[in-house]
């Protein structure tokens, strides 16, 4: 089932626990002290300017450096991908049209498992879809993130523009290819961190 604004939180890692805790604190401040705030939870972003430690930019920049992608576990972890530009327009709509104290979920119905993401990236970059290595999965790695954006769509009239994931990935590959000067200074430190963690 997809996560809805009324789904009880059930965090499975310190990371997800910290996110759940922050939402609960905001709700308490709104209710107790009248703070004018909304909450937005988004699905996984991709697109220009994303830090190269993240899944998609790391796969792209590794390929651009001649390094085979490395996929955690079996790669069947599902993420609900949303282009960063769509995320931005959704946040703007929430800030300008959202109701105080409400929670809005930002997603683009882009559920795709990580193995398929790597296969698409490989194809778009001229490699065989299965040209990647499997590595040990991270502890506490959630199997599926998917959210129900219907409240955002029905109440605020928001709609994603980047609905073709493959086209969005092609644009993202082009951006990282054309902007190596932006990410190259970060690459060595990012890969050293992953190597130190055994990934």
Predicted feature locations:
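C-terminal substrate-binding subdomain of Rossmann-fold SDR/epimerase-dehydratase oxidoreductases
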Residues: 63-199
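Catalytic helix-loop patch of NAD(P)-dependent Rossmann-fold dehydrogenases
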Residues: 1-39, 46, 50-52
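Conserved active-site helix of classical SDR/Rossmann-fold NAD(P)-dependent CH-OH oxidoreductases
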Residues: 20-27, 60, 88-89, 115
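Alpha-helical segments that scaffold the active site and NAD(P)H-binding pocket
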Residues: 27-31, 61, 96
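Active-site micro-motifs of SAM-dependent methyltransferase domains
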Residues: 31, 44-47, 154, 175
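Active-site loop/turn elements of alpha/beta-hydrolase fold enzymes
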Residues: 42-45, 74
């Amino acid at each position: 089932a997809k996560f809805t604004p009324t789904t009880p939180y059930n965090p499975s890692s310190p990371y997800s626990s910290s996110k759940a805790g922050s939402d609960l604190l905001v709700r308490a401040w709104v209710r107790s002290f009248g703070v004018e705030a909304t909450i937005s939870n988004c699905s996984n972003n991709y697109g220009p300017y994303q830090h190269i430690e993240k899944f998609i930019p790391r796969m792209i920049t590794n390929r651009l450096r001649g390094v085979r992608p490395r996929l955690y576990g079996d790669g069947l972890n599902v993420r609900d991908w949303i282009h960063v530009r769509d995320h931005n327009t959704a946040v703007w709509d929430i800030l300008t049209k959202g109701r105080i104290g409400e929670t809005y979920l930002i997603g683009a119905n882009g559920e795709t498992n990580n193995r398929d993401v790597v296969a698409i990236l490989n194809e778009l970059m001229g490699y065989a879809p299965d040209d990647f290595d499997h590595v040990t999965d991270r502890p506490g790695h959630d199997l599926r993130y998917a959210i129900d954006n219907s409240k955002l769509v029905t109440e605020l009239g928001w709609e994603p523009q980047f609905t073709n994931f493959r086209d969005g990935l092609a644009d993202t590959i082009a951006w990282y290819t054309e902007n190596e000067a932006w990410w190259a200074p970060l690459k060595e430190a990012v890969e050293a961190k992953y190597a130190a963690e055994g990934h």
